[in-house]
Amino acid sequence: MAARLDRLKKRADFLRVAALRRKWAAPGLILQAAPASGTDLQADSLRVGFTVSKKVGNSVCRNRARRRLREAVAQVFPAHASAGLDYVVIGRKETLERPYSLLLQDLLAALKRVGALQKTHAAEAPDTASPQS
């Protein structure tokens, strides 16, 4: 069953996910995960927030990186990410130049490393990402 993607928008939600320190840095992105909080959440919803800092470049570069990450998440998360967690995807400089297929592999590997990969897909995910904290 495909989960529904919702967005994290409030700063407090981003800080809560970051405070848990459950993260994995892949060459193309950083993924953070935390148990979802809130009473209005549906059991099959995934909440995802995106952030790209000014280190990545000007606003054109940051928005391009954010668009690439949003599309990768839309492709990977409904089938592979565990529901009941909030996720924050952080863009890096490499997000812009990294081939899209490798960005998808980075996302799958990061899901596996933070323990958020659905059990049915755990055997399929590559473990190619190297830790960079």
Curated annotation (Swiss-Prot):
RNaseP catalyzes the removal of the 5'-leader sequence from pre-tRNA to produce the mature 5'-terminus. It can also cleave other RNA substrates such as 4.5S RNA. The protein component plays an auxiliary but essential role in vivo by binding to the 5'-leader sequence and broadening the substrate specificity of the ribozyme. Consists of a catalytic RNA component (M1 or rnpB) and a protein subunit. InterPro entries: Ribosomal_Su5_D2-typ_SF, Ribsml_uS5_D2-typ_fold_subgr, RNase_P. One of its GO terms (molecular function) is 3'-tRNA processing endoribonuclease activity. Its EC number is 3.1.26.5. It catalyses: Endonucleolytic cleavage of RNA, removing 5'-extranucleotides from tRNA precursor. GO terms for biological process: tRNA 5'-leader removal. Signal peptide: none annotated. It comes from Paramagnetospirillum magneticum (strain ATCC 700264 / AMB-1) (Magnetospirillum magneticum). Pfam families: Ribonuclease_P. It comes from the Bacteria. HAMAP family: RNase_P. This is Ribonuclease P protein component.
